[in-house]
């Protein structure tokens, strides 16, 4: 992988370790659980990742067919611990739309 001027990734050769590092964790809220009915999944990803890289990472990790990727940068939230005020770390949110035949099991039953 090489970096451009604006720290965007360009995948010359897809390295599996780089793809695994792009996707951090699934975001599970009331809104995202409603999106599961429409076969859309929400993940927190690396802020410098592009839609093409996110699509390649999801297809590699979960072995599914991705039909669409929407991304946004949510605003930082203030956080206070005692008298110290700070902000939560910056992240990028990606909403992934899968093909109708595919699904990701976010809640495994044990």
UniProtKB/Swiss-Prot annotation:
Its quaternary organisation is: Part of the 50S ribosomal subunit.
Question: Under what name is this protein listed?
Answer: Large ribosomal subunit protein uL23c
The entry's cellular-component GO terms read:
chloroplast; ribonucleoprotein complex; ribosome
> Where in the cell is the protein located?
Plastid, Chloroplast
The family line of this record is:
Belongs to the universal ribosomal protein uL23 family.
Q: Which organism is it from?
A: Porphyra purpurea
Pfam families linked to this entry = Ribosomal_L23
NCBIfam families xref list:
PRK05738.2-4, PRK05738.3-4
MF annotations from Gene Ontology: rRNA binding; structural constituent of ribosome
């Amino acid at each position: 992988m090489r970096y451009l001027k604006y720290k965007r990734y360009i995948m010359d050769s897809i390295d599996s370790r780089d793809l695994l590092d792009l996707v951090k964790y699934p975001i599970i809220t009331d809104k995202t659980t409603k999106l599961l009915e429409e076969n859309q999944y929400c993940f927190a990803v690396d802020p410098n990742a592009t839609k093409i890289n996110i699509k390649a990472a999801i297809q590699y990790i979960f072995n599914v067919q991705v039909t669409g990727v929407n991304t946004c940068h949510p605003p930082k939230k203030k956080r206070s611990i005692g008298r110290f005020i700070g902000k939560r770390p910056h992240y990028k949110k990606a909403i992934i739309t899968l093909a109708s035949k595919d699904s990701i099991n976010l809640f495994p039953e044990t």
